[in-house]
């Protein structure tokens, strides 16, 4: 009898179930290190459980956020420097949650690629776990999608999903009034927005990712991959102290577009651009691209990653609290009657 012809397997089609299982086992210790009160289940189930009562909540309202890291991924892929891109992913989600007054509780990630490389994926997800641990947020689940034919070799995509909570009635923004003070918390670079523009500027400059960064520090690639700062613990400490009326995460749209999102109708903001020094990376981007200052202000964080809107009579106290938490705090302006954001002084 002729030998029976061997049939196709899922691996023949480009999907390696064994690699997926190996990845789960490899990242379990990292996920376990993010456990916090309320964590019920580990990785591997059909769903993940979280106990709000065990987390200390009595009448909670849930808040959800989802985000990615945009084309910053392209730099991580091209340089092979993927260890911190997961921190960016977490930061983009949990920094948004805290702007609602919520404490981040748990996080799920989505990792998609054409061919699963376990070592690469583990480095990325271990970065996600690091970001979760730093923000008090449990990594309780995720999805790894191996999709042959959908991505070029070596490429991958990331998305994150965070859920937080606050007690009913504690949501932000709340009570924003004319005369409130704007406290700016420093960024450490571009964070995770505007990277399509950044990559275009790098192309115009003729520099490679391994060239020395023109604005100082490490190689250009590593300097631009500095992970987005996590503002969760320090921002929540300020909120719990009282007097904080709003928080604005300065992401895509820059100062010009993000601050008005937390201001009620009829109120705007005046910002003094001379209150802080524009970080060198933004000056280099602006000068290389002949970028006008208004365009810079509505594209990048310009050195201010989070704005705390606080009652004027509590501003000094909250600024001192944030400084004690390790923040670089600058009084950058105030809430005024009107609409939108107006600027005094110059950055460039």
Curated annotation (Swiss-Prot):
UniProt GO BP: 'de novo' IMP biosynthetic process; adenine biosynthetic process
Main location: cytoplasm
Molecular function per GO: ATP binding; phosphoribosylamine-glycine ligase activity; phosphoribosylformylglycinamidine cyclo-ligase activity
Keyword Lipoprotein: no
Catalytic activity: 2-formamido-N(1)-(5-O-phospho-beta-D-ribosyl)acetamidine + ATP = 5-amino-1-(5-phospho-beta-D-ribosyl)imidazole + ADP + phosphate + H(+)
Compartments it resides in: Cytoplasm
SUPFAM superfamilies, sorted: PurM C-terminal domain-like (SSF56042), PurM N-terminal domain-like (SSF55326)
A GO cellular-component term linked to this record: cytosol
E.C. number: 6.3.3.1
Pathway(s) of this molecule: Purine metabolism; IMP biosynthesis via de novo pathway; 5-amino-1-(5-phospho-D-ribosyl)imidazole from N(2)-formyl-N(1)-(5-phospho-D-ribosyl)glycinamide: step 2/2
Oxidoreductase in keyword set: no
InterPro entries: PurM-like_C_dom, PurM-like_C_sf, PurM-like_N, PurM-like_N_sf, PurM_cligase
Highest rank taxon of the organism: Bacteria
UniProt keyword terms in alphabetical order: ATP-binding, Cytoplasm, Ligase, Nucleotide-binding, Purine biosynthesis
Entry-linked Pfam families: AIRS, AIRS_C
NCBIfam families for the chain: purM
Entry's family note: Belongs to the AIR synthase family.
PANTHER family membership: TRIFUNCTIONAL PURINE BIOSYNTHETIC PROTEIN ADENOSINE-3, TRIFUNCTIONAL PURINE BIOSYNTHETIC PROTEIN ADENOSINE-3-RELATED
Protein name in UniProt: Phosphoribosylformylglycinamidine cyclo-ligase
């Amino acid at each position: 009898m002729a030998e029976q012809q061997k049939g196709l397997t899922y691996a023949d089609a480009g999907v390696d179930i064994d690699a997926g299982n190996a990845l789960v086992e490899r990242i379990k210790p990292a996920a376990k290190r993010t456990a916090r009160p309320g964590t019920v289940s580990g990785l591997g189930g059909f769903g993940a459980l979280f106990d709000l009562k065990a987390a200390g909540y009595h009448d909670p309202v849930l808040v959800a956020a989802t985000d990615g890291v945009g084309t910053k991924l392209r730099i991580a892929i091209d340089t092979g420097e993927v260890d911190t891109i997961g921190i960016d992913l977490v930061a983009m989600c949990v920094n948004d949650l805290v702007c609602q007054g919520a404490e981040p509780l748990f996080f799920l990630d989505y990792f998609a690629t054409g061919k699963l490389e376990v070592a690469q994926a583990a480095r990325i997800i271990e970065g996600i776990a690091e970001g979760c641990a730093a923000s008090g947020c449990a990594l309780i689940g995720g999805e790894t999608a191996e999709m042959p034919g959908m991505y070029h070799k070596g490429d991958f995509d990331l998305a994150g999903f965070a859920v937080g909570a606050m007690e009913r009635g504690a949501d932000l923004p709340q009570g924003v009034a004319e005369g409130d003070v704007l406290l700016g918390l420093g960024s450490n670079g571009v964070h995770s927005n505007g990277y399509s523009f950044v990559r275009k500027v790098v192309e115009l400059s003729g520099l490679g990712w391994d060239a020395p960064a023109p604005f100082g520090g490490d190689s250009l690639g590593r300097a631009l991959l500095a992970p987005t700062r996590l503002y969760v613990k320090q921002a929540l400490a300020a909120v719990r102290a009282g007097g904080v009326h709003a928080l604005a995460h300065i992401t895509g749209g820059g100062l010009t577009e993000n601050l008005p999102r937390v201001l009620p109708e009829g109120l705007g903001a005046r910002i003094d651009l001379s209150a802080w020094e524009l970080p060198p990376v933004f000056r280099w981007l602006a000068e290389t691209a002949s970028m006008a200052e208004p365009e810079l202000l509505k594209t990048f964080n310009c050195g201010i990653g989070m704005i705390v809107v606080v009652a004027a009579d509590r501003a000094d106290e909250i600024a001192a609290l944030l400084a004690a938490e390790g923040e670089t705090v600058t009084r950058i302006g105030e809430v005024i009657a009107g609409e939108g954001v107006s600027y005094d002084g110059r950055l460039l």
